Amino acid sequence: MGPLKGVKVLDLTSMVSGPVGAMILADQGAEVIKVEPVSGELVRHMAATHNGVNPVFFSCNRGKKSIALDLKSQEGKEILFKLAEDADVFMQNFRPGAIDRMGFGEKVIREINKDIIYLSISGFGNEGPYANSRVYDPVIQALSGATDIQADRDTGRPKMFRIIIADKVTSLTAAQAVSSALYAREKQGISQHIELSMLDSMISFFWPEGMAGIVFAENEVDVRKLQGSQDLIYEAKDRFITAGAVSDSEWQGMCKALEREDLIDDERFATPAGRVSNAQERKEITGAEISKWESEKILARFKACLLYTSPSPRDAHESRMPSSA
């Protein structure tokens, strides 16, 4: 049982951006019915399977029921309309205009069920030069500024996250939006059409600090100079670790743990603002000091000083081993 018990969701989405959002609703107790083509959704066929199911498909669709329909056939259409009669949520992520051409647009579904929450996920929204373009995660990473945020600090070369991130951020946004729409229907008696783009979701996700440099018009700064403070991977004698200090007390604790109390009074690092603006210098100094210690010992010293810290799963020496490929 979960907070969405009794909520029925029709999930016509595919790939990752929609299915993960619907899966979150299922995790919270909703009855989610995944509507797939007769051949099965594409992700089913994109990796090796175990007992007939591949891990990516499973991890995007757990907790759902599934039905295969030929939505071009009259029978398939009638079944979908029947399912929509008592559904609470209808989710789709076809390219703009496609769902209307298929005959299942928001206006059509609302004629069947006036109280339904209708969610449309797209890459770029319904208007603009990219509106009808095909979209996958790397495209959104590039256009949203993610590749700039991830750029190599030395060369400036844009870099991507090594995971699908835009699809999953959109899914989280979609699940939250649907939950809010269900609450609004309960409290205000309104049923909404939620139009959500992957690009909007990503920009909103990155905005608080990733795009802080452009918040104030005519007072922009290059936020990339500040983001280096997040690259807190250090190499101890035997493995990689992460550790950091944000507050004054944490910085003082780090200096003591490293036996570098002289840095406490260093004007460059004496304030939070100073530690951010001089992040690269600070990282180089702390990195050089951490490299003198065995990881277990320095992590224990950091922990005793109440710093946030953790070992990295990958062994430092293992990571330098040549690839056998």
Go through the PLM ranges and name each one.
Residues 1-187, 213, 217, 324:
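N-terminal helix-loop segment corresponding to the beta1-alpha1 unit
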Residues 11, 34, 68, 120, ...:
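Structural signal for conserved beta-strand scaffold positions within catalytic alpha/beta enzyme cores
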Residues 39, 124-125, 198-203, 238, ...:
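Glycine-rich beta-alpha junction loops
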Residues 56-58, 194, 232:
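Residue-level detector of beta-strand structural context in well-folded domains
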Residues 92, 196, 243-245:
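Active-site-adjacent beta-strand anchor residues
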Residues 182-221:
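Substrate-binding/catalytic subdomain of NAD(P)-dependent oxidoreductase enzymes
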Residues 225, 229-306, 310:
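Aromatic-enriched alpha-helical interface/lid elements that frame and gate functional surfaces
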Residues 308-325:
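Single conserved hydrophobic/aromatic residue that forms the stacking wall/gate
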